[in-house]
Design a protein with these regions (language model features):
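Tandem repeat scaffolds
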Residues: 1-175
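Long, ordered, amphipathic alpha-helical scaffolds
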Residues: 159-229
């Protein structure tokens, strides 16, 4: 295990493998892990990150396995973007300021079939995975999306993070619920129309402006039999 404390990282790479690292109070500035045509999938495994900060960073088309991230803050306005990644035994805890997990591979010059191959691969990958992500001890002040991960593979705090099934949406008039401007209805609409999996996890924001409203909406979903605490 290689230890880095207070280091600053920048730059971009494709088709890389990062393993057996411990990073404490490090800063990542405009870092990008990409996958150019012809390069293998990126691998990020057995890594511990504590107290990191990121500015305009992204990870695309990576297998992220046995990784823990505790407290992640953003230095600019952009979240950490994750494009077309697969997760296995990844734990987020503490304050995770902004992270966007996208189902799309997000590569403008990727071959036309890249998304199709990713989608079928993701379904197969998660069908044999025990669990993908643990967010039970995490707070998300800026919000987070988990559309790219099947809800039943996410370990969560049922008081702040609920699971919604595709079947639950289908048998309900969920659009009639008062979403109070939270945009949770947009997340559900995207899941219903574009999601790969049968369930998704919704997490309330911890920011003071949104926490109570998000919590109330998630309770309404549960009371209506759409969400499961």
């Amino acid at each position: 295990m290689f230890l880095f404390v207070g280091e600053r990282f920048w730059g971009r790479a494709s088709g890389v493998t990062y393993t057996d690292l411990s990073l404490i109070d490090c800063e990542f500035n405009s870092c990008g892990v990409e996958r150019d045509t012809g390069d293998p999938r990126n691998h990020i495994e057995r890594i511990s990150v504590m107290g990191a900060a990121q500015l305009n960073c992204s990870i695309a088309d990576a297998l992220i396995r046995d990784v823990t991230i505790q407290d992640l803050r953003k230095l600019g306005s952009a979240p950490l973007f994750l494009w077309g990644c697969l997760f296995e035994r990844v734990t987020l805890s503490g304050r995770i300021s902004a992270i966007k997990i996208n189902q799309t591979v997000g590569l403008p010059n990727a071959p036309a079939d890249r998304q199709r191959v990713h989608n079928s691969g993701a379904i197969e990958f998660y069908s044999s995975s025990d669990w993908a992500l643990d967010i039970s001890q995490a707070e998300f002040p800026g919000g987070v999306t988990f559309d790219a991960i099947p809800g039943d593979k996410v370990r969560r705090d049922p008081d702040r993070q609920v699971i919604v099934s595709r079947a639950g949406l289908a048998r309900s008039d969920w659009r009639a619920i008062d979403f109070d401007g939270t945009a949770i209805d947009y997340a559900l609409s995207w899941f219903e129309q574009e999601g790969l999996f049968d369930s998704v996890v919704l997490a309330e924001r911890s920011d003071r402006k949104w926490a109570k409203r998000d919590h109330a909406v998630l309770r309404r979903l549960c009371d209506a039999g759409i969400g499961l605490a």
